[in-house]
Amino acid sequence: MRIIAGTHRGRKLVAPEGLVTRPMTDRVRENLFNILGPHLEDAVVLDLFCGSGALGLETLSRGADFCLFVDADPEAVKATETNATTLRLSDEMRIVRRDALRPGTWIKAPGGTGYTVVFADPPYRLTADEAGRQRLAEMAKRLADLGCLAPGAVAMLRAKRGVPMDRPWPGFNLFDERTYGTTTLYLMEYAGTNI
């Protein structure tokens, strides 16, 4: 696993030990970032269920201003910290070991701005059934209620291939859906209101 492009292009990343995380392949990340390209410069990024931090670190390498990394798994937090130290990106980011499904005021973006890019790469079990997908939608609604999302923010939800997106998250419009091997990426844009 490596940084695909930007100021840290080609730098290797470590992944958390164990079977809890499923790092996104370089090919899938490259395709995702080709889609998100125009949204990355000066972005304020929220990387939920961050695992190794590869998604958020890639945005920082490509010109994002700030990234908040959130994961409840101590091995994931450790891997993200190691990668951030290796890339010398600690000043442009913060790592929080918390449950991403329960956002509170601790998750707000610095300076009162809203996040412009949100990554949600939860365990597949959360996207596998309606109850888990509902919990993710409630998380997105809570982020909006807390004022954490900028109008027009772009969000990516990763799910196992074949998992239907019953409906976009509250306040979001689905604008793209891509499947790569066993992974489907749902891309949504925040409209600025809850539906």
How would you describe each model-predicted region?
Residues 1-195:
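Class I S-adenosyl-L-methionine-dependent methyltransferase catalytic core
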